[in-house]
Amino acid sequence: MNSVFVYCELEGTQIEEVSFELLTKGRKLASELGVKLEAVVAGHGVKGKVESQILPYGVDILHVFDAPGLSPYTTRPHTAVLVGLFEREQPQICLMGATAIGRDLGPRVSSTLTSGLTADCTALEIGDYEDKKNKKSYENLLYQIRPAFGGNIVATIINPDHRPQMATVRSGVMKAEVLDENYAGQVVYEDVDAFVKPEDYVVQVLERHVEKAKNNLKGAPIVVAGGYGVGSKENFDLLRQLAEELHGEVGASRAAVDAGFCDHDLQIGQTGVTVRPKVFIACGISGAIQHVAGMKESGIIISINTDAKAPINELADYVIEGKVEEVVPKLIKFYKAHSK
């Protein structure tokens, strides 16, 4: 029970951004606990290509599994790799991205190891817990924090008796930061056949189609986001015009998506995308916990709302009281007149 593990996802031989974010958080947790940070990567043709990507994030030990059957991802081989590795290494904590792969792999591993898992965490901390009923005290547990009950509360979930403590985190929730470009971590090239049986390769991927992203919400310097208060699909088009004028991207709250004002791929928040733009313009957004979780680290937040007491206004740097359909056209007109 002496390490924090991060499962690193791959696209070809390139580590996914969410894994860098988790390595950064994993390094902080490991340092606080006084244990090693370990990472595991499984793919094909990755030897010699992933080490320089992963070690600079402060990884003490990198476990590399390289075999043709490990790429593209399929459930059983990767499950066998993690289960076998965790049974041998006995980690305290395992972090994964809340991605299509993480949502498939995480439950498989936690179920096999009977360890439990908390999905879509918005924060991870180390803390103690006292079980007054059973008169037990626990130290250095992983606090797995996430919105619950429809986003009305923020729950802190712990796993005191089973290991590893497993959590998934959405891309963008944590911030990726290189610790040391020359960090001297150890690399272990594992024997894949010792972990994966031939029958684990029963599923083969015959063909893959990768869609290009429809937007660049995560990388946009300016985001114009709309909520239920926008009022209609037609009014939502005004936000697109403003975003185009500002060279930004359009986003939305879950309420706006559920109302049919826009597609789900624009959703920002706990069940959508996490963004960190320099400027975030919230139009008709009330400020539910789940939405705020996806945009609270924006540089400047501007709220346009008819409700002066809307929760989003407490977070905003500037508040414009008024109807979206009246305020936004004025902003568009102003920027058209003054843009170079």
Predicted regions and their residues:
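N-terminal glycine-rich FAD/FM-binding segment characteristic of electron-transfer flavoproteins
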Residues: 1-340
